[in-house]
């Protein structure tokens, strides 16, 4: 299996450990990740798409044409990128008039959208194509952690089009997390937004942090060791947001934040240097130290 790998903007600029873990994981699974040379921003669906649908669709379609030339479906591990590219692909496949309009724009760049490929999310590929049994085979260090899974908004919705899992009571990420040996802990308002999306973080940080703080309180009450997400923007909001909440409101949480790929990386035995967790604002060391201590106490560890 091979797939075109859409990096997006935040992951490779702020959290390169997500990409590193993904490349190692897919190499072990025998899946070839093909780099999309010349890809742009997705662009953000709740920002660009809300005030200039044509420009948004044209930029997204240009990215999709790169994958079409490569003859591969697109994979992203960012909910925003997934939502934007999936929605644009669906729109242009269904709306012939819009497709013709966008192709007139793309013609100026020597490109044409053909509607030949699909847009997919990392988590969905791991669950449906790889499968839990095969994924469990790459786990070398089972993780005895209690984690709060954050689904985010664009991974499952609009559910009529995306149709990955039940949008209100999903289990796909919980099951993927538990392959690593970690426990997905239920918590209040689990499906609530991280607070950053739709331009809210840029427009009114206090409002965005109010959402984040509510989720963090619920997670803390559930007694979790870490937060696991499938979106670098949500990742940033929980990671950087904890520092901002501390500065603005004086409330501390100190809950480490990991992308699903990084959690799987830990379970594969990757060192923290490869996961680039030092780039995180919230220190992950306490979480890693807990795992090391459990390893030392495990029967047969010597």
Curated annotation (Swiss-Prot):
Entry keyword set: Methanogenesis, Oxidoreductase
GO molecular function terms listed in the Swiss-Prot or TrEMBL record: CoB--CoM heterodisulfide reductase activity
Pathway the protein contributes to: Cofactor metabolism; coenzyme M-coenzyme B heterodisulfide reduction; coenzyme B and coenzyme M from coenzyme M-coenzyme B heterodisulfide: step 1/1
Superkingdom to which the source organism belongs: Archaea
Catalysis performed (reactions): coenzyme B + coenzyme M + 2 reduced [2Fe-2S]-[ferredoxin] + 2 H(+) = coenzyme M-coenzyme B heterodisulfide + 2 H2 + 2 oxidized [2Fe-2S]-[ferredoxin]
InterPro entries (alphabetical): CoB/CoM_hetero-S_Rdtase_bsu (IPR017678), Cys_rich_dom (IPR004017), HdrB/HdrD_reductase (IPR051278)
Biological-process GO terms, alphabetical: methanogenesis
EC number of the protein: 1.8.98.5
Function of the molecule: Part of a complex that catalyzes the reversible reduction of CoM-S-S-CoB to the thiol-coenzymes H-S-CoM (coenzyme M) and H-S-CoB (coenzyme B).
Subunit organization: The heterodisulfide reductase is composed of three subunits; HdrA, HdrB and HdrC. It forms a complex with the F420-non-reducing hydrogenase (Mvh), which provides the reducing equivalents to the heterodisulfide reductase.
Similarity comment: Belongs to the HdrB family.
Designated name of the protein: H(2):CoB-CoM heterodisulfide,ferredoxin reductase subunit B
């Amino acid at each position: 299996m091979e797939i075109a790998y859409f990096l997006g903007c935040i992951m490779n600029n702020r959290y390169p450990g997500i990409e590193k873990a993904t490349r190692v994981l897919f190499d072990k699974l025998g899946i070839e990740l093909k780099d999309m040379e010349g890809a742009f921003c997705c662009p953000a669906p709740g920002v660009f798409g809300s005030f200039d649908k044509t420009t948004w669709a044209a930029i997204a379609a240009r990215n999709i044409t790169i994958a079409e030339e490569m003859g591969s479906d697109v994979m992203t591990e960012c909910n925003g990128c997934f939502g934007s590219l999936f929605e644009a692909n669906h729109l242009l496949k269904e709306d012939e008039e819009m497709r013709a309009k966008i192709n007139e724009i793309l013609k100026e760049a020597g490109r044409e959208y053909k509607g030949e490929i699909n847009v997919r999310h990392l988590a969905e590929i791991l669950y449906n194509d790889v499968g839990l049994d095969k994924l469990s085979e790459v786990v070398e260090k089972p993780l005895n952690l209690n984690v709060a899974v954050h689904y985010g908004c664009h991974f499952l919705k609009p559910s009529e089009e995306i149709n990955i899992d039940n949008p209100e009571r999903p289990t796909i990420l919980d099951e993927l997390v538990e392959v690593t040996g970690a426990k997905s802990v239920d918590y209040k308002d689990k499906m609530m937004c991280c607070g950053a999306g739709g331009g809210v973080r840029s427009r009114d940080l206090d409002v965005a942090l109010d959402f984040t703080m509510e989720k963090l309180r619920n997670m803390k009450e559930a007694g979790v060791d870490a937060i696991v997400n499938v979106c670098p923007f949500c990742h940033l909001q929980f990671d950087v947001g904890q520092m901002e909440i501390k500065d603005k409101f004086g409330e501390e949480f100190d809950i480490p934040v990991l992308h699903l790929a990084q959690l799987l990386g830990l379970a594969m035995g990757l060192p923290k240097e490869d996961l680039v967790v030092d780039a995180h604002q919230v220190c992950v060391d306490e979480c890693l130290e807990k795992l090391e201590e459990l390893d030392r106490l495990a029967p047969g560890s010597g």
